[in-house]
């Protein structure tokens, strides 16, 4: 997908319509990750609540298209599930678009829309102290419990720059079990000397593992997904199989593709196999979506994933 700013499903604001009652997501049995290779594909839209635009635009445009684009996809693709973070954004949805918010609550109740991230906002975790991070989780999940009758148990920071060694400990003490980000690679910041193509994990430089256990300063741990690719990734081929070779007979194309594959395209079955061989857990984690102004994954990705999961 790349850093797509607008998906094919975005449109002018329209009135909320009553959802069809047959849209409940199918809940498959949980796989045995010690035996069954599994790739978790996380549909997501990143939204910078404040960045290079004024706050009213977030309310009038970005939040509405996040809701309505995904509502349209839910009605067309019964296995599609969407994740969106930030209790503060949900608070704004409820205040300014109560009819849309009621429809969103229906999709939450049927397992189609997941209030993710456990926090009020996807905030920085370098400058704030431990209490500030804990309060993000306390207030965020309390809001989710009050409105949706459920809470998240993972911390999702795809777009934050840097994470302290104490973070797993802070998250674990706050009841959080999982963490994910796309911001560790040298593409974004100076990277530590871990990972790399010659490492056992075969990860990009700066990423110690794809999915594994991150231990904090007091020995507490969280499950961490550290290489899910960009939140702006598309699904362009059957990702249950190896990535297709580039067209044409020129072998240099294959070499260039392999060099550029770290952020946009992966051999997911191979990644799952490597992780299983190293850790005993045959699983991996893949962001698919858009940013930085909300919205939804593009429809072609959702359509292809629907075909892959139902074949």
What are these regions (language model features)?
Residues 4-311:
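Catalytic-domain carbohydrate-binding cleft regions of carbohydrate-active enzymes
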């Amino acid at each position: 997908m790349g850093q797509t700013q607008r998906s094919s499903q975005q449109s002018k604001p329209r009135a909320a319509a009553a959802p069809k009652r047959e849209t409940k997501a199918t809940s498959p049995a949980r796989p045995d990750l010690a035996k069954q290779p599994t790739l978790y594909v996380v549909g997501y839209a990143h939204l910078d609540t404040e960045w290079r635009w004024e706050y009213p635009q977030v309310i009038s445009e970005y939040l509405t298209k996040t809701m309505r684009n995904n509502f349209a996809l839910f009605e067309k693709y019964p296995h599609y599930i969407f994740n969106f973070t930030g209790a503060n954004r949900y608070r704004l949805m409820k205040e300014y678009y109560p009819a849309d918010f009621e429809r969103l609550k229906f999709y939450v109740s049927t397992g189609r829309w997941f209030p993710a991230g456990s926090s009020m906002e996807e905030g920085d975790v370098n400058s704030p102290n431990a209490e500030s991070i804990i309060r993000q989780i306390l207030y965020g999940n309390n809001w989710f419990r009050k409105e949706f009758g459920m809470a998240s148990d993972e911390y999702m920071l795809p777009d934050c720059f840097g994470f302290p060694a104490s973070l797993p400990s802070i998250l674990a003490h706050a009841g959080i079990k999982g963490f994910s980000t796309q911001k560790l690679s040298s593409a974004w910041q100076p990277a530590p000397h871990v990972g790399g193509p010659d490492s056992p994990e075969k990860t990009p430089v700066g990423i110690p593992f794809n999915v594994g256990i991150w231990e904090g300063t007091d020995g507490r741990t969280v499950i961490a997904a550290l290489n899910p690719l960009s939140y702006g990734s598309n699904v362009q081929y059957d990702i249950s199989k190896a990535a297709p070779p580039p067209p044409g007979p020129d072998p240099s194309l294959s070499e260039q593709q392999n060099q550029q594959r770290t952020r946009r395209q992966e051999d997911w079955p191979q990644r799952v196999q490597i992780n299983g061989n190293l850790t005993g857990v045959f699983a991996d984690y893949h962001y698919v979506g858009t940013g930085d102004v909300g919205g939804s994954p593009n429809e072609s990705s959702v359509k292809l994933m629907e075909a892959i999961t139902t074949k």
